[in-house]
Amino acid sequence: MSKLKETLREKIEGWRPRTTRLIKEFGNVKLGEVTIEQAIGGMRSVKSLVTDISYLDPNEGIRFRGYTIPETLEKLPKAPGVDMPSVEGFVYLLLTGDIPSASDVQEIAAEFKARSGVPQYVFDVLRALPRDSHPMVMLSAAVVAMQRESEFAKAYEAGVNKMDYWESTYEDFMNLLAKLPTIAAYIYRMKYRADVVIPPNNDLDFGGNFAHMMGIPKPYDDVARMYFILHSDHESGNVSAHTGHLVASALSDMYYAQSAMLDGLAGPLHGLANQEVLRWIQGVMDKMDGKIPSEEEMKKFVWDTLKSGQVIPGYGHAVLRKTDPRYQTQREFCLKHLPNDDIFKFVDVLYKVVPDILVEQGKAKNPWPNVDAQSGVIQWYYGLKEYDFYTVLFGVGRAIGVGANIVWDRALGYPLERPKSLTTAMLEEVAGIKK
Ligand code: CMX
């Protein structure tokens, strides 16, 4: 058994009594109340999910296993000559809560290589889809097509003990994750690069191999590592993470759950916003004939968008109340690698004008930029101009966090999710509205 799986087993066995004790001895302790506004309003802030993989503080942003983004990037091992830690080490951190050693990272890299072969039928499925299908449709279809590979589904059918569900779930997670870079890059090259596919180079790490298969030179390998890590997890309540958790709670396996997760991510209020940001900026650039708008000109574009009833993509957040640290990390990368890029300058002018306008408009609870406001700029700069592909990059990253959560869901025996619904008439009655 790999050291990762062995460590995970120890962690799980140590953790289980904590969960059991909370339910048995403290099950009736209240975490909060639910208002009518929350019931109608998408369950905002209702404390009803548990995860130890990441925690989102409204002001500070995300912590992965207790570490802020700068701490995560600083503490995880890096290969010589690169700035960003490997995805392999990050997977170890999310699963176990520990910072891995360099040899732990190598062991996972070897595991990923051994598991990376994508079955031919997956490529056949992708080729059978209309070429103008959205790349998220392709990614989601490829993932669900692989459900027949599920070790969990086989183990369940064979009557595996509940306490061991996590083991085959872990196998599914690692198997799926190892294949995702190849599948994502295949979609890209098939759809946008005249179907010229670049085979994997198994000497490279997760991020490096992805950059290689995309056909984009250094430092895009670091962009890939940074991108997958930053997008991996944002606690459990966001649409993609929650969808993955919900579907898996029915004991649907990793493939079903991750495919559904991707479908949720594909919405314009969630993961599709990074493509929307670039589309919006391109629209402004067209109107400006390529010239960088002044702050006054940009203010007019922002107000025009708001007055036409649209949102400013890349701004606002359901939980965050400050600038997203994922935005900041990418901005620092831009300042280092592409300070003079026109689109980066556009994004900077936007940063100067949008928050004040959203405050003046008085609707958005958070006027600050989120992760999506900056991420497309970097992709565009490195030649990835087909912006409807950006959510696929988000999806590969998000699969890491959602998968780690699902492994722990099974380890701790989290049950089928089943909140209660009420009718409008019942809400009116609770509110004391007389008819
Ligand atoms: N531009 C214009 N209006 C905005 C806005 C924005 N960027 N962000 C919020 N608002 C509006 C909402 O549409 C809502 O209006 P109504 O009352 O007319 O419905 C009002 O402000 C209150 O919304 P909120 O409570 O501040 O935000 P929500 O929790 O409802 O929604 C989010 C959060 C992210 C969907 C929203 O801010 C938004 O639409 N942003 C633009 C899209 C985007 O960047 N999404 C990516 C989020 C990150 C991710 O998940 O990937």
For every predicted segment, state its role.
Residues 2-435:
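Hydrophobic alpha-helical bundle cores within soluble ligand-binding/oligomerization subdomains
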